[in-house]
Amino acid sequence: MKKNKIVFIFGPTAVGKSDILFNFPKGIAEVINVDSIQVYKEFDIASCKPSVELRSHIKHHLVDFLEPIEEYNLGVFYKEASKIIKNLRDQDKLPVFVGGSAFYFKHLQYGLPSTPPVSSEIRFYVNSLFTTRGKDYLLEELKRVDFERYESISENDIYRIRRSLEVYYQTGIPISQFLKKGQMIEDVLAIGLKRPMEEMRSRIISRVGNMIDCGLLEEIKSLLGKGYDETTPAFKGIGYREFLLWKSRPYSMLNDIIDLIVKNSFLYVKRQMTFFDKIPNVLWFHPDDDLRDILDLIFV
């Protein structure tokens, strides 16, 4: 197995990514989750988190590590993933990124976008800090969150000081990391999984039915009872957000909610495949028919 290789295994929701991992040999690789909802504690069933059995077979990172009220974005993912890659390489273990968030895969391999957009709320917040606490406070804050940037700009360059803090508060990543060049990961084995769309539709219907059988309704009631609502970042996931309609319209039939989850899931699959098809140098497989070829590619 080639040293310093990184493996991507991606594909749409319900394609069967987790099933392949049960066939991995123990102790050689660890999985880094590339999903924006499985990161949250308590949101278990509709997010289709890897099972206890799978996580005992192969270690998973970036699962169940955030509170539901915390924001998760590309910046947090990139920062955490970069640390995990280094740690696994130090242990001579293979990093295997598995999930369906194409945007995260793209920027992990090709680097972060050159300075990301910042919301008007963040700009207002930084401006209020400048107005109420002054330039010296902003300088100390920049020194704390991005010492490299702090050392590289003039203490009188208030525009760049403010911009640097805006980017950090928006993404959780120092602007100095965005400005660096040559961060592309070269040695990536990108494996894509796909099935015919009718097969995907059937699998989604089955998966949503299994969610209900496994207690999704009870999980939703428990989450709402704890005060989580439409402002909770974790509730943006498919399978959760649809039940917010049920909360606001209790006369809605459960079957209508289930149908909406199936519809939204299938539309999401189509969007995922549109994005994945644009990623170059991907080796595409059917997860059932080509399992042996996939394992040979990864571990030989």
From Swiss-Prot:
What is an example of a GO molecular function annotated in this UniProt entry?
Answer: tRNA dimethylallyltransferase activity
Q: Residues annotated as region Interaction with substrate tRNA?
A: 35-38
InterPro entries assigned to the protein according to its UniProt record, in alphabetical order: Dimethylallyltransferase (IPR039657), IPT (IPR018022), P-loop_NTPase (IPR027417)
Q: Which reaction does it catalyse?
A: adenosine(37) in tRNA + dimethylallyl diphosphate = N(6)-dimethylallyladenosine(37) in tRNA + diphosphate
Residues in a coiled coil are none
Q: Name one Pfam family in it.
A: IPPT
Listed A to Z, the keywords are:
ATP-binding, Magnesium, Nucleotide-binding, Transferase, tRNA processing
Q: Does the keyword ATP-binding apply?
A: yes
Cofactors demanded by this protein: Mg(2+)
Q: Which NCBIfam families match?
A: miaA
Q: What is this protein called?
A: tRNA dimethylallyltransferase
Organism for this UniProt entry: Borrelia turicatae (strain 91E135)
The gene that this protein is the product of is miaA
